């Protein structure tokens, strides 16, 4: 079952300007940063909006994108295997099977008819997001 929105993700051209906007101007908290699992380079900054709600800021947007910098919508679920099974049963696209991400949570992906990416995420008690809540 879907339990809420976990995060909205954007690709940003200038992380310092983005952090100034979301943290400095809007007052959200800079919760933590994920390093890329293959390169170790800075990859994603998590901005805490409210308990259990985050904005993901991805490093490295290249050039100007007239369509904006939307990356994906994340929906929190209580059972990642059940949502994957539901997607298959209903004939909806499942872009990848459930897997554990770098943050410690379980995830799988789909897309809407227009190609907008949607992530399903089962939050784990010891994930980076859960630790940021403490």
Residue ranges of predicted features:
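Vicinal oxygen chelate
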Residues: 5-13, 44-48, 63-134, ...
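A short beta-turn/loop motif at secondary-structure boundaries
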Residues: 36-39, 63-65, 99-102
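N-terminal beta-strand motif that seeds the catalytic metal site of vicinal oxygen chelate
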Residues: 1-17, 71-73, 124-134
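Core segments of cupin and vicinal oxygen chelate
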Residues: 9-53
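Acetyl-CoA-dependent GNAT
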Residues: 58-63, 122-124
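Short, charged/polar, Gly/Pro-enriched secondary-structure boundary elements
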Residues: 52-55, 115-117
């Amino acid at each position: 079952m879907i339990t809420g929105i976990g995060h909205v993700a954007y690709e940003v051209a200038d992380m310092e300007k983005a952090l100034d906007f979301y943290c400095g101007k809007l007052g959200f908290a800079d919760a933590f940063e994920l390093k890329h699992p293959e390169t170790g380079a800075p990859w994603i900054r998590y901005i805490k909006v409210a308990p259990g709600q985050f904005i993901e800021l991805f490093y490295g947007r290249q050039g100007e994108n007239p369509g904006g910098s939307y990356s994906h919508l994340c929906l929190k679920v209580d059972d990642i295997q059940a949502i994957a099974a539901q997607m298959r049963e209903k004939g909806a696209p499942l872009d990848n099977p459930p897997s554990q991400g770098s943050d410690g949570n379980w995830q799988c992906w789909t897309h809407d008819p227009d190609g907008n990416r949607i992530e399903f995420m089962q939050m784990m008690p010891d994930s980076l997001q859960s630790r940021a809540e403490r």
